[in-house]
Amino acid sequence: MTFKATVLTLYPEMFPGHLQYSLAGKALERGQWSLDPIQIREFATDRHRSVDDTPAGGGAGMVLKPDVLAAAIDHVSKGDTRPRLLMSPRGKPLSQNRVRELAAGDGAIIVCGRFEGVDQRVIEARGLEEVSIGDYILSGGEPAALTLLDAVVRILPGVMGNDLSGVHESFEGGLLEHPHYTRPQLWEGRDIPAILTSGNHAAIDKWRHEQALALTKERRPDLLEKTQAETK
């Protein structure tokens, strides 16, 4: 099964973007996943190919029209059961758990918002799952979509050279990742922790877990609270 990503956007030239220089780009070349950016404007029906209009009730900015976006969604999703994601700052925060769920599926249809937002009716009528990559505003959904794809594709089977690479990363097991060290042994008066060169793998694993736990307590206590709540 090949992971298939279909991206609805007003800027298809932004894809694959920086992904072509990463593991995701190499995997794309090898056919381990596919990417199909679709121009939303192609589904506009007026002579100006309009995709947006002023917000009902007044206000700043423009809103992506429901008829145009719905036509684009319908075109790419006939008989398609892939999740439909809308990159949106008001969406549910993207988590590593959701990334794993997406990677286990056969792909996703990703809608990149623009302007002030997307007409709420098309969100409801087409069952769009709003997804956020953080509590900040971007100029459009394209950078967010690329971030999501990077997170998903890198954990697809066979993409990382060592399938264990993803096991010890941040958010796996509900913890931030432990610190890393490499040669030289001594650098600017700072030594690699002796435990890491001891050859005692059980002790190394214990040290790494303790470090990950301490970092998580210091920087992201909310992750620990979430993990504790899920295990109750």
From Swiss-Prot:
- Annotated positions binding S-adenosyl-L-methionine: G113, I133, G134, D135, Y136, I137, L138
Question: Mainly localized where?
Answer: cytoplasm
The subcellular localization recorded is: Cytoplasm
Give the enzyme's EC designation.
2.1.1.228
Concerning SUPFAM superfamilies, the annotation shows: alpha/beta knot (SSF75217)
Q: Which reaction does it catalyse?
A: guanosine(37) in tRNA + S-adenosyl-L-methionine = N(1)-methylguanosine(37) in tRNA + S-adenosyl-L-homocysteine + H(+)
Q: Which GO terms describe its molecular function?
A: tRNA (guanine(37)-N1)-methyltransferase activity
Alphabetical GO biological process terms: tRNA N1-guanine methylation
InterPro entries hit by this protein: Alpha/beta_knot_MTases, tRNA_m1G_MeTrfase_C_sf, tRNA_m1G_MeTrfase_TrmD, tRNA_m1G_MTases_N, tRNA_MeTrfase_TRMD/TRM10
Q: GO CC terms for this protein?
A: cytosol
Q: Does the keyword Transferase apply?
A: yes
Keywords recorded for this protein, A-Z: Cytoplasm, Methyltransferase, S-adenosyl-L-methionine, Transferase, tRNA processing
Q: What class of enzyme is it?
A: transferase
Under the heading Pfam families, the entry gives: tRNA_m1G_MT
Q: How does it assemble?
A: Homodimer.
Extract the HAMAP family matched here: TrmD (MF_00605)
Q: Which family does it belong to?
A: Belongs to the RNA methyltransferase TrmD family.
Functional description taken from the UniProt entry: Specifically methylates guanosine-37 in various tRNAs.
Q: What is this protein called?
A: tRNA (guanine-N(1)-)-methyltransferase
Annotated organism of origin = Agrobacterium fabrum (strain C58 / ATCC 33970) (Agrobacterium tumefaciens (strain C58))
